[in-house]
């Protein structure tokens, strides 16, 4: 009989030594949902608060404190009971609501029930109507700025600022045969305007002295500048006559900015009444207003990395003319609009140089693609519901008797709950959990999808997006992807990959 060793010690005779211990493979799901409960819920309520009526006299503030245990009751049923009863494993959420009447100074406070929010089980899944579901992480293009060769043969280069929410801004350089170079811009993918029109719209400090320095630096734009400046002069003179403006240098610069606003507004909103105020509000609101434009934290981080040095270089070249980026604000700064234009023009000028600091971006590199995990996806659904609720609150403020208004009577939670239910029941990213075996369930929770709202569609996705990229190494498995129309659009996180605070995959 052979005697077996009773020692529990394992010996490893491999030449390579022990493998690195595996991390928690469910952390992509658990960490993201925990962050949503601690931070995302509060941010969503802060984004719509305060809600004011059309006169600005009445306002409603909503405040959620994740550390206040009175605002979060424990779940009614356990996971097992939810499965048996075919109900949703959820937790009641409350908010502190404060109604303020600025005319009388009256304040009414209440704790208001906002609905039952589905919560994640220990296994990283959700129980929705008794069935186990997984929310798949989405792989999307990161907000920020990208410089690429033009898609059209006459466009040499183009640079696009993609915000988290708001209008795109695109600058490009056209080079046609036997014609001088022409730089332009597009706002919200509308008709093209000259780059000089965009710069004039930024600030009244954009005077002839600035443009002379600008053209001296980018001499290949000299012909375009002289043509555009002559045309602009005629427009400015007409504008000053129309509004009876005195012919002074200050008025000339003011008229220069106003005519640029009007030209942009004409392209963006053809058919609408062209007034200076409407044009100003459109341009300022499109990129510099927090209500209509949001770069997001990721976009601000990417812009600081890509354009930070260019903004500093422009201050040296042209002087400190424009307002600089504020790290706290997730809107564009005027200095960054100028930096996007100069980066593109420097890229065109240095294209044949052996050494340059200007480089084309690869949109398929994982530095330019990020993960929207479960917490962020639920937060987006919640924001949609809250913005619908905001409209209801405004209407009720105008129709109800001011004396009898209380926070409870203003708030209708139905739009919020229907947005959350709609996400879990019908979203392309909320799926029945694969329960063939424990391993298929685990890989399902680590799945990455480029499809879904805000992502790609099977029909439009080209070969480059689907292909294996060198930046996938150690981040996403290059082998495991379905056959058929989804090939390359569905992937799986590698063993040692993790998601950083900005949603980028690290290894």
Question: Where are the predicted features?
Answer:
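N-terminal non-catalytic structural scaffold regions of very large proteins
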Residues: 1-449, 494-507
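Residue-level signal for helical boundary/lining positions with a hydrophobic bias
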Residues: 126, 479-480
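Flexible, glycine/threonine-enriched loop-and-boundary segments that flank and lead into catalytic domains
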Residues: 108, 447-478
């Amino acid at each position: 009989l052979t005697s077996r060793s009773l020692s529990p010690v394992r010996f490893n005779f491999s030449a390579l030594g022990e493998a690195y211990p595996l991390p928690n493979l469910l952390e992509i799901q658990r960490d993201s949902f925990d962050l949503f409960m601690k931070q995302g819920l509060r941010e969503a309520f802060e984004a719509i608060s305060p809600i004011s009526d059309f006169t600005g006299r009445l306002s409603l503030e909503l405040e959620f404190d994740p550390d206040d245990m009175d605002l979060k009751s424990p779940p009614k049923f356990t996971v097992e009971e939810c499965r048996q009863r075919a109900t949703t494993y959820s937790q009641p959420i409350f908010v502190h609501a404060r109604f303020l009447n600025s005319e009388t100074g009256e304040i009414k406070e209440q704790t208001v029930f906002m609905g039952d929010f589905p919560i994640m089980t220990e296994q990283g899944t959700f129980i929705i109507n008794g069935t186990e579901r997984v929310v798949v992480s989405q792989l999307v293009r990161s907000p920020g700025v990208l410089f690429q060769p033009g898609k059209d043969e006459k466009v040499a280069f183009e640079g696009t600022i993609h915000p988290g929410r708001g209008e795109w801004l695109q600058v490009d350089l056209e080079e046609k045969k036997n014609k001088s170079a022409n730089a332009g811009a597009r706002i919200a993918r509308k008709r093209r305007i000259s780059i000089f029109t965009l710069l004039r719209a930024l600030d009244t400090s954009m005077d002839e002295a600035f443009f002379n320095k600008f053209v001296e630096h980018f001499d290949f734009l000299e012909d375009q500048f002289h043509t555009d400046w002559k045309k602009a002069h005629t427009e400015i003179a007409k504008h000053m006559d129309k509004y009876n403006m005195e012919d002074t240098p200050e008025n000339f610069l003011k008229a220069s900015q106003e005519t640029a606003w009007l030209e942009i507004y004409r392209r963006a909103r053809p058919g609408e009444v062209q007034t200076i105020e409407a044009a100003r509000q459109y341009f300022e609101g499109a990129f510099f207003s927090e209500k209509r434009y949001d770069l997001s934290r990721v976009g601000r981080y990417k812009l600081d990395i890509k354009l930070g040095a260019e903004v500093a270089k422009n201050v040296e070249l042209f002087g400190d003319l424009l307002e600089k980026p504020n790290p706290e604000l997730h809107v564009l700064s005027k200095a960054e609009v100028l930096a996007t234009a100069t980066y593109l023009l420097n890229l065109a000028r240095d294209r044949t140089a052996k050494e340059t600091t200007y480089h084309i971006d690869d949109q398929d590199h994982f530095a330019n693609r990020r993960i929207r995990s479960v917490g962020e996806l639920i937060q987006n659904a919640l924001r949609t519901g809250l913005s619908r609720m905001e409209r209801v609150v405004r209407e009720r403020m105008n129709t109800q008797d001011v004396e009898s208004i209380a926070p409870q009577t203003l708030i209708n939670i139905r739009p919020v709950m229907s947005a959350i239910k709609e996400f879990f029941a019908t979203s392309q990213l909320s799926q029945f959990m694969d329960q063939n075996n424990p391993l298929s369930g685990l890989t399902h929770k680590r799945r990455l999808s480029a499809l879904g709202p805000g992502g790609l569609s099977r029909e439009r996705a080209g070969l480059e997006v689907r292909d294996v990229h060198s930046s996938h190494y150690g981040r996403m498995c290059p082998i495991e992807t379905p056959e058929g129309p989804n090939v390359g659009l569905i992937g799986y996180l590698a063993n040692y990959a993790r998601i950083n605070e900005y949603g980028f995959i690290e290894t």
